[in-house]
Amino acid sequence: MPKMKTRRGAAKRFAKTGSGKFKRRKQGLRHILTKKTAKRKSRLGQSATVDSANIGQVKRMLPYA
């Protein structure tokens, strides 16, 4: 059986933490930033974890993570 391929787009977007969760960036910090408050932009800069409902999908996309 051949090796499973990693989805390269997902590999660039998600990182596995030591506890086995997946880290991701928050959306909304690329453009149209003038109407967003400094507090909101600061919070958007922090990383978030992948929700439990989506962990299975991420694991399938990253078989070797």
Swiss-Prot record:
Keywords: Ribonucleoprotein, Ribosomal protein. It holds the Pfam family Ribosomal_L35p. Residues 1-43 have a biased composition (Basic residues). GO terms for biological process: translation. One of its GO terms (cellular component) is cytosolic large ribosomal subunit. SUPFAM superfamilies: L35p-like. It comes from the Bacteria. GO terms for molecular function: structural constituent of ribosome. Residues 1-49 are annotated as: Disordered. HAMAP family: Ribosomal_bL35 (MF_00514). NCBIfam families: rpmI_bact. Belongs to the bacterial ribosomal protein bL35 family. This is Large ribosomal subunit protein bL35. It comes from Maridesulfovibrio salexigens (strain ATCC 14822 / DSM 2638 / NCIMB 8403 / VKM B-1763). The lineage of its organism: Bacteria, Pseudomonadati, Thermodesulfobacteriota, Desulfovibrionia, Desulfovibrionales.
